[in-house]
Amino acid sequence: MRSYKPYIIKLCIVFLCFWGWILTSYAQKVGANDYFYVLNTQQGLSDNCILQMMQLADGRLAVRTPKGINLYDGRRFSLIPLPAEKAESITKYKGQTHLYADSQDRLWVKEYQKIFCILLAEGRLLEHPLDDLPGNGKEDKMKMMRNGPARNAIQDLFVDSRKNVWVVMGDSLLNTQDGNQIHLKKEWGCLQDLDTDGKQVYAFMDSGIVAVFQKDKLAYTTSAYSAAEAQHYRNTSLTVQTPSGQFYQIRTGRDEKNKTDASIFLHFNPETRKYSRIFACDYILHTLNMSSDNQALISCQHGYLMFDFKLGTTPREVKELALPDGKSLTTGINTVYRDKEGAIWLGTYHDGLIY
């Protein structure tokens, strides 16, 4: 009797080879164990220039492109346009694109001296959002500051890790949820980042100083470096708090003496009240994502950097990515994000999303 086993085995091999070819045409290898896929305008993204992204509480990915906010649910994109004329002015913010999600299910899109607000539940842009602040019965304090002798306008806005909205008005920092008001001293410089651990409020200034408050009282200040070195890193700041309460920060600026860009990656430990330097370079670091106290991802002009602090502070540099069409991407990675499932997302200037 004729055996069909050899033919079945051959068919299985052909079948597996076929599907292997199909899958590898979409998944490309980045490093030893890294594979990625590409999402761009062909998959419904409004445009291929990614300015910033973050994962929302419901699992969706919010992606800022020049045309607006693209919300990705794992299957398709939906676009919420952000017309320039609908932006509100925040004169003290001079950084890059930053996304915040607050406790009222609003997404704040902060850019150089302007801000947008999206009502996520309704999927629409909220007009004049600063006029609606604050909520929870705190209008009197806000009105007093706006209508008082100084007639302070809202000049900047932050959302902390507890999803509270804070606004800067003159030399005051106001929590719009509970009315806590903090005085910022002029000699500290300009506020660039803010966060809280539930007990203390941390105000990160462009001078490298962090001012720490309990309620509205100053607890202490400390600095990341000397006043002379601070001149190199005044331009931008991005601070991330880990679940254990540690702070990691990238700062950028310009080294005028050497005529180069300047960036530094820092760790601030609230328990010791001290800063430590992790990494410095003569090019611009873009975005920072921390998956734990032991691992960090930073996007930069040359690709992205992967830090594993268990192995030291020297990063693994990923400078070249092989795209599905056979081309290589060597520059143009603007932002990096690790989602709740551990997947790494890369936002590029010209090639959409890579994950």
What name fits each language-model region?
Residues 1-355:
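Carboxylate-rich, polar loop motifs that coordinate divalent cations or form catalytic acidic clusters
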